[in-house]
């Protein structure tokens, strides 16, 4: 059975903003998001993104005390899903997901995987586009990304 790939909103927003949303599809194929994530994204979804919601609404509400609705719903769905990977960037959300035993990656992990899978030749042009947005990318993090991507 193929691993389920779940995503929070930030990866979709930032990659769409720089014209690279298709990278997620090329790296992972189909992904799953929740209604809350779809509402935060606010744009028409490509056919390779499907919507599924967590069954346990109370658990989602408890998570909302720590993180926003999109992150809470994505984490709650990940808890209910067996063998999944959650794409999430928010530090608080990442820490919470890891505490719950959820495998995670982030936008930069998607970009690195695209490079390591020979989907893209270099992460540098994508990082340059991201730096032109309001997405935070420190010099230290950029160096780590380049190193992991073998650049």
Q: Predicted segment positions?
A:
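A generic membrane alpha-helix/interface feature
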Residues: 26-28, 89, 107, 119
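Acidic, PIN/NYN-like endoribonuclease modules and their adjacent C-terminal/linker elements
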Residues: 35-37, 43, 94-151
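Active-site-proximal, substrate-binding regions of enzyme catalytic domains
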Residues: 2-84, 91-94, 100-102, 125, ...
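Short, Lys/Arg-enriched, disordered terminal segments
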Residues: 1-3, 150-151
């Amino acid at each position: 059975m193929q691993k389920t790939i779940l995503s929070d909103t930030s990866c979709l927003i930032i990659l769409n903003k720089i014209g690279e949303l298709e990278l997620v599809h090329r790296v992972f194929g189909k992904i799953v998001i929740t209604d809350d994530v779809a509402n935060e994204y606010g744009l028409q979804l490509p056919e390779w993104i499907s919507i599924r919601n967590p069954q346990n609404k109370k658990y989602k509400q408890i998570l909302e005390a720590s993180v926003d609705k999109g992150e809470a719903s994505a984490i709650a769905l990940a808890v209910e899903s067996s063998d999944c990977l959650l794409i999430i960037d928010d530090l608080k959300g990442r820490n919470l997901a890891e505490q719950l035993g959820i495998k995670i990656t982030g936008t930069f992990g998607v970009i690195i995987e695209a490079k390591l899978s020979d989907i893209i030749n270099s992460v540098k042009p994508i990082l340059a586009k991201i730096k032109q947005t309001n997405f935070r990318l420190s010099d230290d993090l950029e160096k780590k990304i380049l190193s992991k991507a073998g650049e």
